[in-house]
């Protein structure tokens, strides 16, 4: 799609004309402007279902950014959200939610049966309309192949369809939705994937699934220059 059309339909006159003619009105995508740009800014809301295993890790990763971190409160199904971080501000989502969120993150890694998927509804139903243009939706689950019981595997597998459906709904505003499946005890490997999916680097990536396996704790790298000090043979 040409830049001229994109600029035109995002003017007041162009937007009105596009709506009258039934033409698409794509949102300008936020792109990476400098290498040291923070991976996420603005307000970020985190929620979690029963038995969430990655909630503290997610709080630590997002807490390293300039973003203002909030954790969802209100519904009983989201009680685990309070474990996000002591820096996170509690936000009751059962009332009127004001402002816009740069990202909505949900830890579903502990869900054990389909009934517990209710937590997803309780978190996203009152907040999805508050997702900002170019916002990010990220869901963390457990890889169904590592689940020991059928109900747990079914609940985790359902996350894929949910994320793809959300991605289609929010795509028109330049937002993305992605899913990360982690193996048991692989929470410490989430950092790079979370940073990527929340950043402008993932502007064209939506409805995707990434699997993360367990690995030994690696030496921390510079997220701005991860290949610094290394030699590449091409």
Write out the residue ranges for each language-model feature.
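Glycine-rich nucleotide cofactor-binding loops and adjacent beta-alpha elements
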Residues: 1-226
